[in-house]
Amino acid sequence: MGARSVDTTFDVGIVGGGPAGLSAAIWSARYLHSVVVVDSGDPRNWETRRINGFLGFEGIRPADLRASGRDLCRGLGVELIDAIVLRVEHEGEEDFALCLEGGGRVHARRLLLAIGIRDVWPDLPGLAHVYGANAHVCPDCDGFESRGKKIVVIGNGRRAVGMALNLTTWTDDIIICTNGRPPELDEQEYCDKLDALNIPVLTERIETVCYEGTSIHCLKLADGMQLDTDKVFFTIGQYPADDLCAKLGCERDDEGHVIVDEHGHTSVHNAFAAGDITPGPQLAIKAAAQGATAALAIHKSLVPESRKLAPRKHAVSSR
């Protein structure tokens, strides 16, 4: 469905159709709310071969999980719009308008931002050919499949050190390569931990990833050295998939993640967030759980006060 205006004001408007957004849509619909999901169709894990550790769906392809979620949404009456949201505007004191590319508008009483994030990729020939199979960005997601393997972490500074330390859960054969960038190991703690775990740091620029099919043979460095490895993990940086959250005024951390409470509330009234756009581990199953949690909070915010009990007052014991 293309960008268009919708006359209805939905109870719940969701931006993003990944695990967080679809999970929130499913649960909001189960509470009999009218729900719309607007999705750009450009997920972060576009080339990932499988999702690991998702209860009941081990090894499912991300596209298949999304398709299954969309089918379930349709069965529950959720409106699915394939479009890009350019901005979100306030309508009155309570509602929102989702302004779509092409001029359409969608109206909602509550907003869930599940837009995800994007990874900064190193400019490295051959990397795209092995991404999702033997090149990764998430040790939590793909560390188990890397157990006992030779791994090169591409990155520098705290990010690279943290990723390398995380990967020691599964292997002790790790090298950090900064790909020509300064190491930025300014804190003695970084050097001490890397030295104790025998993790060397190379600063030479990588010329190319040598591969066959989806298997990596080595990384060819600018000085002619060939760095043997089985897998590559890279951590150059991340950024929000778009600037909707910033434009709306949501409070964010230093890396651009939207700060939420345990129920998914953002700093903006009636606006919620879930999934990778929020701080913490970036796992599909966590995103889905956050979406469900946010849906419950959204439902409670939509229930009239006449259908709620007053909060229970807890007695304070005296000693």
PLM segments and residue spans:
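Glycine/Thr-rich phosphate-binding loops of Rossmann-like dinucleotide-binding domains
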Residues: 121-122, 162, 229, 242-243, ...
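Beta1-alpha1 glycine-rich phosphate/pyrophosphate-binding loop at the start
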Residues: 3-4, 10-67, 159-184
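A conserved FAD-binding loop/helix module that cradles the flavin
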Residues: 25, 161-163, 274-319
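FAD-binding core/adjacent interface of flavoenzyme oxidoreductases
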Residues: 1-13, 78-149, 231-233, 258-262, ...
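Active-site glycine-rich loop that binds ribose-phosphate moieties when present
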Residues: 133-141, 150-163, 184-185
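A Rossmann-like FAD-binding core segment of flavoenzymes
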Residues: 67-100, 105-107, 171-258, 303-319
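Residue-level detector of alpha-helix initiation sites
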Residues: 18-20, 117-119, 158-159, 278
